[in-house]
């Protein structure tokens, strides 16, 4: 699609561009969202990206205010889907009213793309699961159907649902979660969801009620067309009452073998026993010898077959494929377990009907088609679940395009089928459990049922509540489906949790035994995160993307490997230039990132020359941004380690990766010029600001790691190239306002943002802040570049920009604000030139708002002191994912729960000014919001806790409190401009220290290293 603007971007003078004015204001249609901009004049609508954003004072104020926790009600509940399973254990949503939905725990492949932004998923469930209360003779479901006033507060990992109704004497609070304990990866990877219900009597009289949990047996849920038995049983232990759901094959040992029934062999000249419609099937089955030679050998084991191409009217291939028709068989009773058949021809696509279908009770229950191949293959329907029912077969050719034909051979009814997969090997074979912690007063559903029937079990707890009294009841839902295969990636890779537990029963027993610790530490982390001075909205947005780990984007395989899609079911290989942006995993569960570096990136993915395939074993080329990222991430993972053993193990491979980048540089001037594959999915050519900037950051990281392992020669080499690159980067790529690219004139056909204002142009410096490197890019020009992104790329109505500029995917609808990927404010370079002859889908990225990139820039702005702009970018994104519009817990790019969005944790680190180096026993904070009164959570290699600093009478006091694990410290970096002396206390004991001041920064060195244990506090007093 060509640029639709009436004034091409290439004709916009800078002065004219700066005169563009505001569009509309955000949140007009959603009154609960704070108004971002306005009022605007009619002239403000004339241009798409105004220099003056016309931010309303109220909206700006809301960016900085602590505010109150956001509680969702009414229509805001409709899209809510907060993941409540363990890391890599599947995907299960807690809905806005407490119901579970999107049960992606059965190892079924689900593909997602970009569509769920414009059309959000609505709650649905393949099985019955619910909780209810019995009050007298009334059963009240714990959802919006049962209570008139339902509210939801999501504080990941815990979702809180409150239920009230003026007509009921009780109120209920639900806290639902899966154990989530930073640094304790295994206990955060359990296939379990906990439900803690607190029921309160609001009346003046005693209330008797029963809280009941209900669960349908979901074992073999997607294979109910075969024969099998569902089994429910109850297991009572000292601490739990458990409904255990399983499945097993029918016992066929005593069944007499039944002979096959050949239903149709086509060895007759007409369609005797079949009703014929249309022109595709002719007057009867065709001899294989009469089939046109260009169709080849169609196979099968009969002389005649059905072939809707060979028998169709028409003289050309196109006319024959365009013919349509249908064959309908005589009715029959299903008396065998399988129907086998030979089938070939076209593959059913879209809404067209093509192939063989089984119709039972007037409904199509099973269907098969060819594989766009004339050669037929032997396939089967498993029909035991329909035994005794009347049925018929239909052979349908409703397709009119290429491969619009079907071929069918012999059809047999049989009990024996060599291709039958053993039940215990099925993807959804396994167990489920719903347990009540404690004794149940009522149970039901202890029985068996055949696969074609539903099997539901219940557990109930009776409660007697005095006036005003509250009681808490806890249920645990667990699942165990070990037979994982990942489409387009791994066959039979298995689930990590299945190596720890043999069944759902074992999962429940582990959780019950350790419940006080698991629940207590999960809530402790939640409370620590929110016990902060940072705004509630900011804490919500920067942490909630951590839930991506608990979706089907991420997996823990049976061999312990961490693996991920880019987004759910989309783009294999734990993509290096997507996960490059993600900061959450490394800080919360660093062992996963260390495994990814050691096992995959610097292991199976690395070539002998040092290049790293950015999709591991699933592609064969490196990407320049990913390659730099592997080096940067190696330093980060080293910093989140206790000692230097990890770095020493991987250093030779890290060095090799860096040497490949240096070779890519060619002339060692610090700027890469040759082909550069990258996260925008094509090769760019020439001097590209953001790719060379990342390269410079990687050089700085490699130099630091080389220092730490004693490779002084390589450290010097990296720093020499870095120094040259820093000079050339500023001199050659800075245009006085921002950094742009020098396009290789030999590759004008390739996509390149050229002189456009590109979102990642100073990404290298953003990364340098994340890992505490010295400055990589010049401060003045870098800030100017960020200001240019604010000026040229931040659109109060990014959806309108996309609508008018096109093409691209919809990640911001009209009326929604966002930071655009690239705009073209300079003469001589516009979208058409940036596209060159590249694919429209890739060039269309320039017109989009992509969450992960926006998080990255927002964090960088905050690091550089552009706090208002950084918060505005982050808040605009947050408001796009308002619950009234779409699921707040599903940031979408190329797939649901897109991994790049875990960059949001980096925005939080920027606000804290956080720095950490475990092996050096160093920690530091430089808060960017309210430094005079600041509090935040932090993580380290072995522990986590709370940092705070306050100022009274001009004197600052800081505290580092460890709440879980431990923290070893030798140095502490803080900011204080006026302090003359520093005193440090641990558990009340004064420590001997040395202080070095550089500007506002005070580096405090302890004479002796200390270890702060859980419950202990280190206090720093400035005077």
Placement of each model-derived feature along the sequence:
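N-terminal secretory signal peptides and thylakoid transit peptides that target proteins
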Residues: 5-25
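Active-site core of glycosidic bond-cleaving carbohydrate-active enzymes
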Residues: 567-613, 627, 648, 652, ...
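Short beta-strands within extracellular/lumenal beta-sheet-rich domains
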Residues: 310-335, 377-379, 459-460, 956-958
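Acidic/polar, glycine-enriched structural segments that form the non-catalytic walls/loops
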Residues: 38-65, 71-76, 160, 165-173, ...
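Non-catalytic C-terminal accessory modules of carbohydrate-active enzymes
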Residues: 88, 99-101, 107-175, 182-185, ...
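Extracellular carbohydrate recognition and processing domains
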Residues: 359-390, 396-404
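Extracellular carbohydrate-recognition regions
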Residues: 255-288, 417
């Amino acid at each position: 699609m060509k640029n639709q603007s009436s004034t091409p971007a290439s004709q916009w003078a800078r002065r004219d561009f700066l005169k563009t004015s505001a569009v509309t204001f955000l949140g007009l249609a959603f009154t609960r969202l704070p108004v971002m901009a306005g009022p605007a004049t009619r002239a403000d609508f004339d241009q798409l990206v105004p220099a003056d954003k016309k931010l309303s004072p109220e909206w700006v104020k809301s960016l900085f205010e602590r505010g109150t926790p956001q509680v969702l009600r009414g229509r805001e509940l409709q899209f809510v889907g907060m993941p409540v399973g363990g890391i890599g254990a599947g995907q299960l949503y807690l809905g806005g009213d407490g119901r579970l939905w999107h049960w992606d725990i059965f190892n079924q492949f689900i593909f997602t793309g970009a569509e769920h932004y414009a059309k959000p998923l609505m709650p649905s469930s393949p099985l019955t699961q619910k909780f209810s209360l019995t009050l007298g003779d009334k059963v009240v479901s714990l959802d919006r159907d049962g209570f008139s006033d339902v509210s939801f507060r999501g504080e990941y990992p815990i979702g809180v649902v409150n239920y009230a109704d003026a007509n009921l004497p009780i109120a209920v609070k639900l806290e639902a979660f899966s154990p989530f304990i930073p640094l304790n990866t295994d206990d955060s990877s359990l296939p379990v969801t906990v439900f803690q219900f607190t029921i309160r009597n609001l009346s003046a009289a005693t209330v008797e009620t029963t809280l009941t949990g209900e669960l349908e047996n979901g074992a073999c849920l997607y294979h109910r067309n075969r024969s099998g038995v569902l089994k429910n049983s109850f297991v009572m232990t000292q601490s739990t009452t458990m409904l255990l759901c399983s499945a097993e094959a029918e016992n066929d040992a005593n069944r007499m073998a039944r002979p096959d029934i050949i239903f149709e062999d086509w060895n007759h000249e007409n369609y005797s026993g079949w009703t014929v419609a249309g022109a595709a099937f002719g007057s009867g089955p065709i001899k294989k010898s009469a089939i046109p030679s260009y169709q080849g050998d169609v196979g099968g084991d009969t002389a005649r077959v059905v072939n809707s191409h060979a028998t169709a009217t028409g003289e050309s291939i196109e006319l024959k494929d365009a013919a349509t028709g249908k064959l309908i068989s005589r009715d029959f009773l299903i008396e065998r377990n399988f129907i086998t058949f030979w089938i070939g021809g076209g593959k059913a696509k879209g809404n067209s009907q093509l192939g063989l279908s089984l119709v039972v009770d007037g409904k199509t229950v099973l269907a098969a088609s060819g594989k766009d191949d004339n050669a037929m293959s032997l396939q089967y329907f498993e029909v035991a679940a329909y035994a005794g029912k009347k049925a018929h077969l239909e052979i349908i050719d409703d397709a009119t395009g290429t491969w619009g034909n079907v071929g069918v051979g012999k059809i047999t009814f049989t009990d024996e089928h060599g291709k039958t997969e053993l039940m215990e090997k099925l993807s959804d074979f396994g167990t489920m459990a719903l347990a009540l912690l404690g004794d149940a007063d009522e149970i039901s559903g202890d029985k068996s049922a055949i696969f074609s029937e539903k099997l539901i079990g219940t557990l109930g707890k009776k409660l007697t509540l005095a006036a005003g009294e509250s009681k808490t009841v806890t249920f645990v839902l667990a699942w165990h489906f070990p037979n994982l295969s990942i489409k387009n990636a791994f066959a039979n890779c298995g689930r990590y949790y299945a190596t720890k537990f043999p069944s759902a029963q074992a999962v429940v027993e582990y959780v019950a035994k350790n419940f006080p610790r698991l629940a207590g530490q999960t809530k402790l982390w939640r409370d620590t995160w929110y016990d902060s001075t940072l705004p509630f909205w900011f804490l919500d947005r920067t942490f909630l993307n951590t839930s991506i780990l608990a979706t089907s984007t991420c997996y823990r395989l049976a061999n312990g490997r961490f693996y991920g899609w880019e987004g759910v079911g989309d783009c294999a290989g734990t993509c290096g230039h997507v996960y490059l942006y993600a900061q959450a995993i490394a800080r919360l569960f660093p062992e996963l990132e260390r495994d990814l570096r050691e096992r995959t990136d610097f292991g199976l993915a690395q070539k002998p020359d040092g290049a790293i395939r950015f999709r591991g074993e699933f592609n064969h080329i490196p990407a320049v941004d990913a390659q730099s990222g592997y080096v940067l991430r190696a330093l980060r993972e080293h910093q989140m380690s206790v000692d230097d053993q990890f770095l020493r193990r991987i250093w030779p491979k890290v060095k090799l990766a860096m040497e490949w980048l240096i070779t890519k540089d060619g002339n060692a001037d610090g700027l890469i010029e040759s082909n550069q594959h990258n996260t925008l999915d094509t090769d760019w050519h020439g001097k590209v600001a953001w790719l060379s900037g990342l390269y410079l950051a990687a050089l700085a990281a490699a130099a630091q790691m080389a220092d730490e392992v004693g490779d002084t020669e390589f450290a010097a080499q990296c720093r020499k190239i870095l120094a040259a690159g820093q000079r050339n980067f500023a001199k050659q790529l800075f245009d006085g306002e921002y950094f742009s690219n020098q396009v290789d004139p030999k590759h004008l056909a390739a996509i390149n943002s050229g002189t456009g204002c590109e979102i990642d142009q100073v990404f290298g410096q953003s990364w340098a802040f994340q890992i505490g490197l010295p400055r990589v890019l010049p401060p003045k020009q870098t800030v100017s570049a960020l200001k240019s992104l604010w000026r040229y790329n931040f659109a109060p109505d990014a959806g309108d920009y996309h609508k008018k500029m096109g093409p691209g995917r919809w990640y911001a609808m009209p009326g929604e604000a966002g930071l655009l990927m690239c705009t073209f404010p300079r003469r001589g370079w516009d979208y058409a030139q940036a596209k060159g002859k590249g694919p429209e889908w890739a060039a269309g990225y320039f017109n989009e708002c992509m969450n992960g990139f926006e998080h990255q820039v927002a964090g960088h702005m905050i690091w550089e002191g552009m706090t208002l702009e950084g918060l505005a970018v982050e808040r605009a994104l947050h408001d796009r994912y308002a619950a009234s519009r779409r699921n707040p817990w599903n940031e979408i790019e190329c797939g649901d729960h897109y991994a790049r969005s875990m960059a949001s944790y980096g925005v939080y680190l920027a606000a804290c000014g956080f720095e950490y180096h475990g092996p050096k026993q160093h920690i530091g904070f430089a808060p960017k919001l309210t430094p005079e009164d600041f509090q935040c959570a932090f993580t380290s290699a072995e522990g986590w806790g709370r940092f705070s600093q306050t100022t009274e009478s001009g004197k600052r006091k800081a505290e580092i409190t460890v709440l879980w694990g431990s923290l070893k410290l030798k140095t502490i970096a803080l900011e204080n401009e006026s302090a003359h002396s520093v005193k440090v206390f641990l558990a009340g004991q004064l420590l001997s220290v040395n202080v070095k001041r550089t500007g506002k920064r005070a580096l405090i060195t302890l004479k002796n290293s200390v270890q702060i244990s859980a419950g202990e506090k280190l206090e720093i007093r400035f005077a």
